[in-house]
Amino acid sequence: MGVGELRMCSERLSMMGTLSSEFKSCLQAVTEQPRIYADANVAAGLVAFMRDRLRWDVLFVIEHDDLRRASDQEHNRVARRLLRTLITFDRDFLENKRFRPSKNGGVVVMSVPDQRTRRRLLQSLDRNIFGGPVQHERRKALATSTIPLEGRKIDVHPGWDEQ
C-alpha cells in the first residue's frame, strides 16, 4: 500500500464516525421532537399531554414491563443510553452524589401540586428549553444536540422560568 492509498484510507476513516455518532445522526434525521423518558411516577394523563399537545416523543416506563420496576439508577442509565431527557417527580434525582450530572442525559424534576400547573410548566419547558412549536428553527437546532439537557438537571416548580 503506497502513501497515496494510505492517505485515502485515512481520509475515509476520518469521515466515518463511531456507531454511536452514526446512530445520533440518524436519530436527528428522524425526529425533531424532544425525546423524553417519563418514569413511573409521572401520571398517564401528563404523558398523554406531552405526546398529544406538545408533540413530544415520550417513552413511558409504565408501558414497558422490563422498565416498570427498574431502580432509579437504571432509569438514569437507560434514559441516557436511549438519548432521552428523564422527567420525574422523584427529588432523589437532584442528589449529585447518587446521580452525577456528567452521567445523565438531562433530568427534569417536577415538584408541582396540581395538574393544571404541571401542564403550564411543561408548556414553559417546551418553549424555553426545547424550542417549542413557535420557535421551529430553534427546535431543529436543538435536535442536532440530540439531548438538549445532557449533563444538566432542572428543578421545575412554580416560578422556575421567571428566575
Regions found by a protein language model. Give the residues of each.
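Divalent-cation
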Residues: 17
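Short beta->alpha junction loops
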Residues: 62-68
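Acidic, PIN/NYN-like endoribonuclease modules and their adjacent C-terminal/linker elements
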Residues: 20-30, 34, 39-40, 44, ...
